[in-house]
Amino acid sequence: HVLEVGVFFGSSLRMWQDFFPHAQIVGLDSFKGVQGYMCRPEDKWCNHGRTPGQRLTFDNPESFLQEWRSGHDASSALSRIQLVVGNQSDSADMERVVSELLPFSPFDIIIEDGSHLNGDQQRNLAQLLPILSPGGTYVIEDVHSSLELGYDDPPGSADTTLRVVEHFNQTGVLHSRHLSRAESHSLQRSMRSVECVVLGLDRPMYKQSGACFVTKKREKGGGGAAF
């Protein structure tokens, strides 16, 4: 079972369905597009009857799904894909989302690729790690937000996601202004290891990108996740 937080316009759903041909895939998003986002000529997800400069938003998950499968033979894959509506930045809404995700859990892989805000990355980890399989992998994508301006913490400061997990790897202690004490302690008990990779990019939008891979502890006497 695979969960992706932050579906954007669906290209990654198609990638996961191809990469994991037997997996059940759940996509979590508001499915409203990105506020103010305009299609660009290089945006492949805007090619379904859209033109550059046109705003791309969706009224509901059904309209998103219709757009997503437009021009593609996705009938066989649709039975493996479920969509859940939620706001990753709203802690109360995420409590509801976790309850809605329980029938699909535990997940073997969770990919968080939403707002890229440090606070959302860390709170979502605390909220969703309990429904990850023991030994499973939780991926925090686009951790360049820890290093660049324009996000919710100064670049490289102590509460950015990269610095928080670096401190955890060095000390076994996880502390951040974005997490409650209970959330921090719960993560410390559940996280076995974190490995991060950051790469330099030659792109106008991002100068660097990267991801952190969190491995959840295995239960005593239990097996790991099956990929």
Residues covered by each model-derived region:
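S-adenosylmethionine/decaboxylated-SAM
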Residues: 1-227
